[in-house]
């Protein structure tokens, strides 16, 4: 899987792909603070979408990830043939989810993915597994949140 992905992305992203594949299962654990944030955003009427570089297996095991239940739409790379941060991945995501980049706020753990989204008109921030920082970034972007 790693070789197949790395053939289609810049070499500067190879290490990130290798780390992602190694840690993928660990990152699928429930994340109560993230679930609380997603629930709060849904209560306020925000539409939430997942854009993920992942395999077909995601659909099967995503039922066990509570955060996925908050999503209005899910885009996974294996179903379209593009990977973040490829421009075509974002264009396909916008089209399939019927969203405008300028109306979106993108959160991702890869700076390259955020930069690609920004180039196409999105606003966003890199998520460093730091919930207070993420909440601060969302507030600074004009997204109202409760105090945590």
Model-derived regions, located:
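Residue-level preference for well-ordered alpha-helical positions
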Residues: 6-7, 94
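Hydrophobic alpha-helical core bundles mediating ligand binding, dimerization, or RNAP-core interactions
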Residues: 2-6, 20-25, 58, 62
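Asp-based, Mg2+/Mn2+-dependent phosphohydrolase catalytic module
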Residues: 39, 55-148
């Amino acid at each position: 899987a790693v070789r197949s992905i790395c053939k289609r992305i810049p070499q500067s992203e190879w290490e990130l792909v290798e780390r992602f594949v190694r840690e993928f299962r660990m990152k699928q654990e429930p994340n109560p603070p993230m679930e609380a944030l997603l629930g709060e955003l849904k209560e306020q009427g925000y539409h939430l979408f997942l854009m993920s570089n992942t395999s077909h297996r995601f659909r099967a095991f995503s039922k066990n990830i509570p955060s996925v239940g908050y999503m209005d739409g899910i885009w996974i790379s294996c179903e379209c043939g593009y990977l973040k941060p490829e421009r075509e991945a974002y264009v396909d995501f916008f089209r399939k989810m019927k969203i405008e980049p300028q109306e979106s706020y993108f959160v991702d753990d890869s700076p390259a993915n955020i930069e690609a989204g920004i180039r196409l008109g999105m606003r966003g921030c890199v998520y460093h597994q730091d919930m207070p920082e993420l909440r601060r970034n969302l507030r600074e972007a004009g997204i109202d949140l409760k105090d945590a």
